[in-house]
């Protein structure tokens, strides 16, 4: 049986996860990073994307909206704006958010905060991508 480590995922409105896990895979700014027990210490930014979490025999997927990960000797902490399990995602709301972001990106550049619209589009696309695996 694989060694476990404590994984905490915290958002502004809740503790999304606080459990002993075997593995976590997150998307960092330099690519996907697999975290196991005794991983080297690190702090790095996260990209908007899916993450995988091995809890016992179950491999779970969740979305995270960027943030930071800190891997310590005792635990790993992810601080993110949002984290959701597939069953928590309101598909129609995510589709509407995606459509709004795409429409904003089509407007004149001077009228739109392009950076914010691109982030909104990435978040919506990420959420919808995870629901397709349900």
Swiss-Prot record:
Chain segments annotated as coiled-coil in the UniProt record: none
Keyword Ion transport: yes
Keywords attached to this entry: ATP synthesis, Cell membrane, CF(1), Hydrogen ion transport, Ion transport, Membrane, Transport
Membrane association type: Peripheral membrane protein
GO molecular function terms listed in the Swiss-Prot or TrEMBL record: ATP binding; proton-transporting ATP synthase activity, rotational mechanism
GO CC annotation, single: proton-transporting ATP synthase complex
Protein location: Cell membrane
Subunit structure, interactors included: F-type ATPases have 2 components, CF(1) - the catalytic core - and CF(0) - the membrane proton channel. CF(1) has five subunits: alpha(3), beta(3), gamma(1), delta(1), epsilon(1). CF(0) has three main subunits: a, b and c.
Family as reported in the entry's similarity comment: Belongs to the ATPase epsilon chain family.
Protein name: ATP synthase epsilon chain
Protein's organism: Alkaliphilus metalliredigens (strain QYMF)
């Amino acid at each position: 049986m694989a060694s476990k480590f404590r994984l905490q995922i915290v958002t502004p409105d809740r503790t999304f996860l606080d459990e002993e896990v075997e593995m976590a895979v997150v998307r960092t700014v330099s690519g996907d990073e697999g975290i196991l027990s005794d991983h080297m210490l690190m702090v790095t930014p996260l990209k908007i994307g899916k993450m995988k979490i091995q809890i016992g025999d179950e491999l779970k997927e969740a979305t995270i909206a960027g943030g930071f990960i800190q891997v310590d000797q005792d635990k790993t902490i992810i601080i993110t704006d949002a984290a959701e399990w597939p069953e928590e995602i309101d598909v129609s709301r995510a589709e509407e958010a995606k459509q709004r972001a795409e429409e904003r990106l089509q407007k004149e550049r001077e009228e739109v905060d392009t950076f914010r619209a691109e982030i909104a589009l990435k978040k919506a696309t990420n959420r919808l991508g995870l629901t397709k695996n349900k």
